[in-house]
């Protein structure tokens, strides 16, 4: 088909124009203002703008300083909000929300998260806000090239080890969703908006995200039809239930693993309150998107991973909660993935990696899956 997305240069995505050579001195000066006794650390950049995903900058650092006569060496990770000129995926980045959620999850649950250390919210130091957290050693199923393409530690593992990782990741999600009274504990995520349901507020945010994405790349008739479908098929029962803490970008590509067990749950940019079905559907749908990518590359992918029946059964066994129908949430996830592809496509145009497409939907690697979910032919 003429508008079929091409795999092309998916193995190379430029995320930032930041000059990392200036970082050691800048971060050293800032750290001296937050470390005990005003210690002046020596800072080394271990890797530049690195990310398992396609959004915030992730910079790995080592800081060395003297404290109470002792030599301290700490490996840290800086999560830095992208600059507007680097075509960010999201309209806004609340790193303060991410920092506080990670801190609370670490305090309230046994879900493995990095220890968050310090946050700079003004943007005066690096040009945009950032926070520092402890570095955690682990491996992640890759996004680029997608883990479903094979030739990586997860795809090449025995099926029982893949299932072990899947179940452990669903268990982390189940634990997050079991934090009691999430609406009060994480009330800062509502930003004072208490009218309507959390799902309605989330939907309005996604609609504004799409409008933001359109500015850089053009409108999508498929997405606009999908928004109408979502409104006319609104999941009233799921929307009315007590909201839980949503990880947001809940998928295996945002977890560090050791021996097929999670050691750090990462990437909280989409954190929100809402129906638990949204996180579960996103986790399954994310794998389906990667399966679509494998299919476009004429590869078999990993069809036995993240099957809905398996994920549902594991989740219910751990929480005692029977999930509602996930179909609406798959369609909704498809819209959000399309917004990501619109913004990463606009970024690739900005950095000269591709020409601006005539048809924005040529960027949607999962367009066929979306049309199938909507009952449209493709």
Curated annotation (Swiss-Prot):
Species of provenance: Mycobacterium tuberculosis (strain ATCC 25618 / H37Rv)
Binding site for Mg(2+) 2: 267, 269
Enzyme Commission number, as recorded: 2.7.1.-
Keywords: Antibiotic resistance, ATP-binding, Kinase, Magnesium, Metal-binding, Nucleotide-binding, Transferase
GO MF terms, alphabetically ordered: ATP binding; kinase activity; metal ion binding
Leader sequence segment: none
Superkingdom as given in the UniProt entry: Bacteria
Name the UniProt record assigns to this protein: Putative aminoglycoside phosphotransferase
Purpose: Might catalyze the phosphorylation of aminoglycosides and confer aminoglycoside antibiotics resistance.
Top EC class for this record: transferase
Residues binding ATP: 79, 134-136
UniProt-annotated binding residues for Mg(2+) 1: 254, 267
InterPro entries (UniProt xref): ACAD10_11_N, AGP_Transferase, Aminoglycoside_PTrfase, Kinase-like_dom_sf
Recorded family membership: Belongs to the aminoglycoside phosphotransferase family.
GO aspect biological process, one term: response to antibiotic
Residues at the active site: 249
């Amino acid at each position: 088909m003429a508008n079929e997305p091409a795999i092309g240069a998916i193995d190379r995505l430029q995320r930032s124009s930041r000059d990392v050579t200036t970082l050691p001195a800048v971060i050293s000066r800032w750290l001296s203002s937050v470390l005990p006794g005003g210690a002046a650390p020596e800072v080394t950049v271990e890797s530049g703008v690195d990310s398992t995903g396609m959004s915030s900058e992730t910079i790995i650092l080592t800081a060395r300083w003297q404290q109470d006569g002792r030599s301290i060496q700490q490996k840290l990770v800086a999560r830095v909000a992208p600059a507007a000129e680097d075509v960010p995926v999201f309209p806004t980045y609340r790193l303060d929300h991410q920092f506080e959620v990670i801190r609370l999850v670490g305090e309230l649950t046994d879900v493995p998260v990095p220890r968050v250390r310090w946050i700079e919210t003004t943007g005066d130091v690096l040009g945009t806000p950032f926070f520092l957290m402890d570095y955690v050693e682990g491996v992640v199923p890759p996004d680029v090239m997608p883990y479903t393409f094979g030739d990586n530690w997860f795809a090449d593992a025995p099926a029982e080890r893949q299932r072990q990782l899947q179940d452990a990741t669903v268990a982390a999600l189940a634990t997050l969703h079991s934090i009691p009274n999430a609406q009060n504990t994480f009330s800062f995520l509502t930003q004072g908006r208490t009218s309507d349901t959390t799902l309605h507020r989330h939907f309005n945010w996604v609609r504004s995200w799409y409008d933001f994405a359109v500015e850089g790349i053009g409108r999508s008739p498929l997405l606009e039809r999908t928004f109408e479908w979502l409104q006319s098929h609104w999941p009233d029962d799921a929307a009315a239930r007590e909201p839980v803490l949503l990880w947001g970008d809940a998928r295996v590509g945002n977890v560090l693993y050791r021996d097929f067990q999670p050691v750090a749950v990462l990437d909280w940019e989409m954190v929100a309150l809402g129906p638990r079905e949204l996180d579960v559907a996103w986790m399954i749908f994310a794998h389906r998107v990667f399966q679509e990518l494998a299919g476009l590359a004429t590869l078999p992918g990993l069809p036995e991973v993240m099957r809905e029946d398996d994920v549902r059964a594991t989740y219910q066994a751990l929480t005692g909660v029977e999930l509602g129908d996930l179909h609406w949430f798959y369609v909704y996830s498809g819209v959000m993935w399309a917004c990501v592809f619109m913004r990463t496509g606009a970024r690739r145009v900005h950095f000269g990696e591709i020409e601006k497409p005539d048809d924005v939907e040529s960027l949607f690697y999962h367009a066929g899956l979306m049309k199938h979910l909507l009952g449209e032919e493709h």
